[in-house]
Every structure is written in structure tokens, then in C-alpha cells.
Amino acid sequence: MQIRADFDSGNIQVIDASDPRRIRLAIRPDLASQHFQWFHFKVEGMAPATEHCFTLVNAGQSAYSHAWSGYQAVASYDGERWFRVPSQYDADGLHFQLEPEESEVRFAYFEPYSRERHARLVERALGIEGVERLAVGTSVQGRDIELLRVRRHPDSHLKLWVIAQQHPGEHMAEWFMEGLIERLQRPDDTEMQRLLEKADLYLVPNMNPDGAFHGNLRTNAAGQDLNRAWLEPSAERSPEVWFVQQEMKRHGVDLFLDIHGDEEIPHVFAAGCESNPGYTPRLERLEQRFREELMARGEFQIRHGYPRSAPGQANLALACNFVGQTYDCLAFTIEMPFKDHDDNPEPGTGWSGARSKRLGQDVLSTLAVLVDELR
């Protein structure tokens, strides 16, 4: 039996794999950082119909150790169809078990979104009416950061921005973007026609390609948490944020959505800008309208989420707060779970890539309703 992680988004360290019933592994920390939680590895040479038991021995020292309670790892035989496997967390680590049907299995923290799939998504997007590669930034290690613009009407005047996967381990964020982009392919979608008559979309499907490739949880290749770099981005340590900010200055912003995943909270929710110094009753009304409209479409809810911050005490190094304050616009962080969505559980898959895609499409419906109210 061989355990490998030498591939896109791979992350694992093998301690002892001599006994299939007591396989001991550890998660490698992020590059230039002590954060860790994301794992993704492949096991070859498994004995079908024999129970294999895995333990991540350093799970208790991970970035969000409390998040392991109630979490179920994901597995796949083909890298396409992922399912949850029985998992338990205790003082000795995270344990999960599988009696495989085949000899090769992948395990991961969440359904991975590969760089290869990202490239196919961008190429497919460029074949959609009105979509162009407006600009391309460069990551610390030289990977492309594509900014796509969707513009179908010369009189459209609003600029709606959606960025994803600032935190590289949050792969549900690019699944969200895939769903959003796929919806733009529908020629008879009246909601999208209404939205794009008034607004252009500015899309960054993956903000942190280096971190995602290397199997990081939180940081880029320089050890920088991009969602703590917006107040003073650096062309050296956070060129990903610096690039997007330059493009925002060039084109303007009328709405901003930052797409994320949350390790601990088993719900879909949003965090707004209520703690910003520039927060106004207008923005409060827009936040309420957005939440109401998105909640009416299924998976989103408002009972669970982050505690509201005190007025005027915002951390402007966060993207949502910085952009909302700078451009006086509706700005949200959209969070999806690594676990299941407890309001609508699907035990076989938990929250998944497919559900993330549907949420992306529901967000477009919400924007179509709100487009006349944004300014």
C-alpha cells in the first residue's frame, strides 16, 4: 500500500502505514505559515472489502481544532464523485474508516477543485457571449489570476464583483464560481438578461492559485493570509490582492461578494459590513434585502453565522470590509460549510461541489432582483 500527495492540492505526511487498520498520518502546515487543516491524499494498493482505518494525529493542533467535531471526511474512487466516510474526533486525532470497493481511493477535507479544472472553466467562460479575459495578474510563484468581465449591453453601468478562494483550502468557493459561470451559458435566462442589461460582472474564480496547488489552508506561497492584506497589499507578499485592487480602482465597484468556506459552522451564511465606519441605513437595507431574497431560494439562512461586530470597529484588512468602506457599496462575505448544511442535510455527501454550484446560481438570481436598488 502506498500513500501519495505529490499532486495538485495534495497534503499529507505518512507516519506509519504498515497496518491497514492503524494508518497514522499528519497534515503538513501551509508554506511559510503554521496554519493547517486541509488534507488531500491518494491511497494505492488497498485491499478491497478490508476495513482501512486512518488517523490524522495532529488534528488537535490544527487551525480550527474545534471544527473536527461533527465533521466527516470525503473520499472518491475516481476524483469526480465524492462521498462522506464515517469520521470521529478525539484526543488522539481525527479518525476515519473505509472498507473500499476498489484498490485506489482519494481522501480530502473537501471536494477539491483542481487547477486543470480551473483552466477548463476559464476557457469555457471565454466562449460565452459577452465574456472576456479583462486582465491577468500574477501570483507570488507566477501563476495566472484571471479577471473575467461579463458585459452584454453597452449601456450597462453597474460593476458587480465576485472573487473566490482567497483562502486556498476553501475549494467550495471555486465550485460556487463554476455554477455562476455555467448559468451564464443559458441563452433564454430572463433573470440574467435583466441583470446584464444593467450591470457588468467582474469575476475572479481563484484568488490564490499558489496556495491551492500546494495544499494550503489559509495562505499564499509567501505565507500571507490574503483576506488580511486588503488595507496595505504588497506587490511582493500579496500580489494577488494588489492586482485586484488596481483593477477595482480602474473600473469601479457597485457590489462586492467574497466567496469562502467555514470550517466550524454547519450552515450557509453571510457576513456584512455593519462594523464599518461608513455603514449607513442604506447599506443596512440592502444587506437585509439581499439576505431575504437569497434565503427565499433554498440553502441560505440567517439564524447562524458570525457574531455582529461593534459599530465603527471593523477590521479593514478584510476584503469585504475594505471594499464596502472604500466604494460605499453592498459587500458580503459568503460562507459555505466544510461539514453539512444542517438546515438541509445530505448525509451521503454533506455540503458538496454540486451544492456550491447551485448556491452560485441562486446568488445571480438574487442580484437580478436587487440590481435596480444597488445605487
Give the location of each predicted region.
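Extended acidic/polar, glycine-enriched regions
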Residues: 88-139
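Short, Φ-rich (hydrophobic/aromatic) sequence segments
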Residues: 39-41, 122, 291-294, 363, ...
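His/Asp/Glu-rich mid-to-C-terminal helical/loop segments that flank catalytic regions of hydrolases
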Residues: 341-375
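Short, P/G- and charge-enriched loop/turn segments at secondary-structure junctions
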Residues: 28, 320-321
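Short helix/loop capping segments that flank catalytic or ligand/cofactor-binding pockets
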Residues: 35, 64-65, 108, 115-118, ...
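Active-site/substrate-binding loop(s) of hydrolase catalytic cores
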Residues: 130-150, 155-315, 321, 326-349, ...
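A short beta-strand motif that forms part of the nucleic acid-binding face
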Residues: 58, 111, 164
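Extreme N-terminal flexible tails
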Residues: 1-101, 105
